[in-house]
C-alpha cells in the first residue's frame, strides 16, 4: 500500500464510524495495520483508550498495564513535555514505550510519540512502538493524521457527554418542578430514609412520621417515575423498592435542601 491508499484506509474507518459510539480499539488496529507497529492511544490521564499489538513484548509489568488499561502516572505526565511529534526514540529515552528493565532485549526498539490535540487543548497521546526499523516520513505523516482523527473523535465524545449531562439535569429539574410543595417535602424525607441510590421504604411509616397522607407520597413517586428519574416497585407488606436512575437527581435534591 502506498501513502494515498493508507490515508484512504483511515478515511474509510472514519466514515464507517460516523454517528456510532467511538471505537478507539478499531482506530488503534487500523493505525497499527497501516504503520506496522504497536499502537497505544492514551487519554490525558494515561487511560489506555485503544491498543493494537503487532509485535509481542514479553514483560509481566507491561502485560499487567495492558490488562488494567492504565499507563503509569509519572510516564503519562512526562508525555506532556512533548508538544510535537518525537520520532525514533530509543530504549534509553525516558519516553520509550518498552520495558527499561529489559533493555538488553530491546536494544533496537524505537518509539514515536505524537501529541493528540483538539480544540486548542491536549487531549491525549498516540504512541507507536517497533522492535526494529525506523519510522520513516510516510509513517509520521500517517501517525499525525491518525492523531488528528483520534482528537476529533475524543472531542465528539466529550461533546456528547456534555449534551447528555445537560439533558439529565434538565429532566431532573422538570421532574422536581412538577412536584407540589408537600410532594417535594415527601420526596426529601423519602431519600433521607433511603440514604443512598436505592432501598426499601414503607410509605405509611413516613407519612405518619412527617404528617402527610400516603397518597402524597404515592403521587410524588409516580411523577418522578414517569419522568424516568427513579423506578419503584411494590413488594407488598415489605414496602416499596426505590432506585434512582438519574445520577443528577440526588445532587439536585441536596441543593434544594441547602437553600
Swiss-Prot record:
Residues 1-155 are annotated as: GAF domain. SUPFAM superfamilies: Winged helix' DNA-binding domain. Its main location: cytoplasm. One of its GO terms (cellular component) is cytoplasm. Residues 203-222 bind DNA. The modification Phosphoserine is found at residue 215. The keyword Cell membrane does not apply. It is found in: Cytoplasm. One of its GO terms (molecular function) is DNA binding. Pfam families: CodY, HTH_CodY. One of its GO terms (biological process) is negative regulation of DNA-templated transcription. The keyword DNA-binding applies. Keywords: Cytoplasm, DNA-binding, Phosphoprotein, Repressor, Transcription, Transcription regulation. InterPro entries: CodY, GAF-like_dom_sf, GTP_trans_reg_CodY_C, Transc_reg_CodY_N, WH-like_DNA-bd_sf, WH_DNA-bd_sf. DNA-binding global transcriptional regulator which is involved in the adaptive response to starvation and acts by directly or indirectly controlling the expression of numerous genes in response to nutrient availability. During rapid exponential growth, CodY is highly active and represses genes whose products allow adaptation to nutrient depletion. Belongs to the CodY family. This is Global transcriptional regulator CodY. It comes from Lysinibacillus sphaericus (strain C3-41). The gene is codY.
Amino acid at each position: 500500500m502506498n501513502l494515498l491508499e493508507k490515508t484512504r484506509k483511515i478515511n474509510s474507518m472514519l466514515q464507517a464510524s460516523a454517528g456510532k459510539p467511538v471505537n478507539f480499539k478499531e482506530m488503534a488496529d487500523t493505525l497499527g495495520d497501516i504503520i506496522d507497529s504497536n499502537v497505544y492511544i492514551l487519554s490525558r490521564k494515561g487511560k489506555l483508550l485503544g491498543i493494537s499489538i503487532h509485535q509481542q513484548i514479553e514483560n509481566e509489568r507491561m502485560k499487567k498495564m495492558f490488562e488494567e488499561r492504565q499507563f503509569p502516572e509519572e510516564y503519562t505526565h512526562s508525555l506532556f513535555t512533548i508538544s510535537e511529534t518525537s520520532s525514533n526514540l530509543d530504549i534509553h529515552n525516558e519516553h520509550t514505550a518498552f520495558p527499561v528493565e529489559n533493555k538488553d532485549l530491546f536494544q533496537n526498539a524505537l518509539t514515536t510519540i505524537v501529541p493528540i490535540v483538539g480544540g486548542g487543548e491536549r487531549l491525549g497521546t498516540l504512541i507507536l512502538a517497533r522492535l526494529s526499523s525506523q519510522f520513516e516520513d510516510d509513517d509520521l505523516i500517517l501517525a499525525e493524521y491518525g492523531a488528528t482523527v483520534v482528537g476529533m473523535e475524543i472531542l465528539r465524545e466529550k461533546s456528547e457527554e456534555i449534551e447528555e449531562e445537560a439533558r439529565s439535569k434538565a429532566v431532573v429539574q422538570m421532574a422536581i418542578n412538577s412536584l407540589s410543595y408537600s410532594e417535594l417535602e415527601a420526596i426529601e424525607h423519602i431519600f433521607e430514609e433511603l440514604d443512598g441510590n436505592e432501598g426499601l421504604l414503607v410509605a405509611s411509616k413516613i407519612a405518619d412520621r412527617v404528617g402527610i397522607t400516603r397518597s402524597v407520597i404515592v403521587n410524588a413517586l409516580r411523577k418522578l417515575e414517569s419522568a424516568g428519574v427513579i423506578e419503584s416497585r411494590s413488594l407488598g407488606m415489605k414496602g416499596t423498592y426505590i432506585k434512582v436512575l438519574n445520577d443528577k437527581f440526588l445532587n439536585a435534591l441536596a441543593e434544594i435542601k441547602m437553600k
